[in-house]
A protein has these predicted regions:
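Helix-terminus loop motifs that line ligand-binding clefts
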Residues: 93-108, 134-193, 199, 205-210, ...
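Carbohydrate-binding/catalytic loop surfaces
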Residues: 103-115, 158-181, 235-254, 321, ...
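Well-ordered alpha-helical scaffold segments within catalytic/enzyme domains
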Residues: 62, 66, 88-91, 122-133, ...
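Acidic/polar, glycine-enriched structural segments that form the non-catalytic walls/loops
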Residues: 1-111, 346-349
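Active-site core of glycosidic bond-cleaving carbohydrate-active enzymes
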Residues: 116-145, 210, 273, 286-432, ...
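Non-catalytic C-terminal accessory modules of carbohydrate-active enzymes
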Residues: 373-381, 385, 393, 398-525
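Structural helix-adjacent loops and short alpha-helical linkers that scaffold large soluble proteins
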Residues: 64-79, 95-97, 130-140, 199-214, ...
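Acidic/histidine-rich catalytic neighborhood
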Residues: 222-292
Length: 525
């Protein structure tokens, strides 16, 4: 019995374990882990936790300073928002398992049933590429480990190769809506893009030839059997699809789907050519394993070279065939009480206008940014931005990044504020269902790709820093091939310095700059 006024301390130990076991085996593993945990005291655990986060914030913190006192409160909210986002990403996934992916809600809620989407490769991967490259590799190895399921899924769609799922826990397609599960091809091309992005930034040829090439080959096979040839225009295209904009279904020649399919087909053929020259034994083994026909890579190139990309003479891409003919809806005329539209409009009504749920054309202009000139991006941004309703939480950050590139800094700052505080301020009134983890990843990209102007799809890293009006300074670091690049942005200049690793050539405002362990200052242009 406890006497009055007597204090009692109770130590509680909890073991959370997942190793694929079931029943008695899992129970015994838990008991063993509990015994092992007793060798660690609370003080030890706290010290290890503190050391982990100290190391993380040392290389991954993002600091924002206000221009003056009148802006301090607003900037403090943005500072809190971006640190919240960074913390949640690091907590959600650290690369410790190749059997798990990043669910749309991470570990914070039950919405989406824990499923991972193509957001992993298109939105989350850049964060890990520049803060924890091994974790980025583990995310791609999840896709390799689930390749057998993707092969089976393609067969269900009467195709060859690998069709990765739109929603999954373990590699199987888990989306119950056929119009999403069967018509959205972007998961497969996102995996191809993710492999390309990872290898492009790390030069990890061992991964590429051991794991990546097989995935790329099977994705290309799927694309080559899912594509169709139009006799009318004499070009290949994808028919009966749904692009990233889920407000339009069963469309033909979605620009994103066609463009990303073209890139996936071409990259697979390029990798096989390089592999045959650099690693002939691995190439021969792969060809035997997948029974590659000698003419397949050439056919992929032929399709890619003749892919229809719906582009108007003024460089405005038509989102899909007939999009320019759709009735226009003024987004500002829709009462706030009718949002979200999925809850208030008839399902088919959403499909009958030129209103867009999230970036579609702008999405591939963002992913392969260096392949398009500034004027093309400006024309498409000016056309599609007013038509986008942002019912996807990923949408604002993509627009902010492109707006910053186009020097539309007021728009960029406005979109950024939404992206960083989406869950903290419960903008979508659904934070109770869990955090928007993949949107949180885009908030990080909003800083690095948006205001710092980083582009990672060219022959070298490129920067074009542009600071929002109310900020005095922005500082952060990124990791790249064993280096840590510290960046301090001011209104008039940006200072670059390597705090780890050998010298590195980058481009800043189009000019080549050599980074060393000495600070180098570049004037704002």
């Amino acid at each position: 019995l406890v006497a009055p006024g007597q204090a009692v301390q109770i130590d509680k130990r909890v073991v959370v374990l997942f190793n694929g076991q079931q029943g008695d085996d899992l129970w015994q593993s838990g008991q063993d882990a509990m015994v092992q945990s007793k060798a660690v005291s609370l003080d030890d655990a706290q010290a290890a936790q503190r050391a982990y986060w100290d190391a993380y914030w040392h290389t991954s913190d993002i600091c924002i300073e206000p221009k003056d006192e009148s802006m301090a409160e607003a900037v403090a909210a943005e500072q809190q928002g971006i640190r919240f986002c960074s913390f949640q990403l690091a907590q959600t996934y650290n690369g410790g398992s190749m059997r798990h992916n990043i669910g749309a809600k991470g570990l914070t809620g039950e919405a989406y049933n824990g499923h991972a989407f193509w957001d992993t490769e298109s939105c989350c991967l850049p964060f890990y590429l520049f803060t924890n490259p091994e974790a980025a590799k583990s995310l791609l190895l999840f896709r390799y480990n689930t390749l057998p399921m993707a092969l089976e899924r393609a067969k269900m769609l009467d195709c060859k190769g690998a069709c990765y799922p739109i929603a999954t826990l373990n590699g199987d397609e888990a989306c119950p809506l056929w119009q999403h599960a069967s018509l959205q091809l972007q998961p497969s091309t996102a995996v191809s893009y993710g492999i390309w992005h990872y290898v492009h930034l790390t030069d990890d040829k061992a991964f590429l030839y051991r794991y990546g090439a097989e995935m790329l080959l099977q994705i290309a096979r799927f694309q080559a059997t899912r594509v169709g040839f139009s006799e009318k225009i004499g070009k290949y295209g994808f028919f009966g699809v749904m692009g990233p904009d889920e407000f339009h279904m069963m469309v033909n020649n979605n620009a994103y789907t066609n463009y990303m399919g073209m890139r996936a087909l071409r990259y697979a053929a390029d990798v096989l050519d390089a592999m045959r020259a650099d690693a002939p034994e691995a190439y021969a083994a792969l060809c035997e394993k997948v029974e590659l026909a000698p003419d397949e890579p050439a056919q992929w190139r032929h399709i890619a070279d003749n892919m229809y990309i719906p582009e108007a003479p003024n460089h405005l891409f038509e989102q899909h065939d007939g999009f320019f003919e759709l009735p226009h809806t003024d987004i500002n005329s829709i009462p706030v009480s009718e949002f979200p539209l999925y809850d208030h409009w008839a399902y088919d009504r959403i499909y009958r206008t030129d209103m867009i749920k999230q970036p579609d054309v702008l999405m591939f202009l963002y992913l392969y940014n260096s392949s398009f000139d500034t004027e093309t991006k400006r024309i498409n941004y000016d056309f599609y931005q007013p038509r986008t309703i942002h019912e996807s939480s990923l949408s604002p950050a993509i627009h902010s990044i492109l707006a910053a590139e186009l020097d539309k800094m007021d728009e960029a700052a406005s979109f950024f504020g939404y992206a960083t505080r989406l869950d903290l301020d419960n903008y979508n009134r659904n934070t109770r269902e869990g955090l928007h983890i993949t949107s949180i990843a885009m908030a990080w990209a909003n800083i690095v790709y948006g205001f710092a102007g980083l582009r990672s799809d060219d022959t070298m890293l490129r920067f074009a820093p542009r600071l929002p009006e109310r900020w005095k300074q922005l500082t952060f670091s990124v990791m790249y091939r064993g280096r840590v690049i510290a960046i301090s942005m001011g209104a008039d200049k940006t200072v670059f310095q390597l705090t780890q690793g050998d010298k590195l050539a980058v481009q800043v405002y189009g000019e080549t700059v050599e980074l060393t362990d000495e600070p180098i200052s570049v004037q704002r242009q």
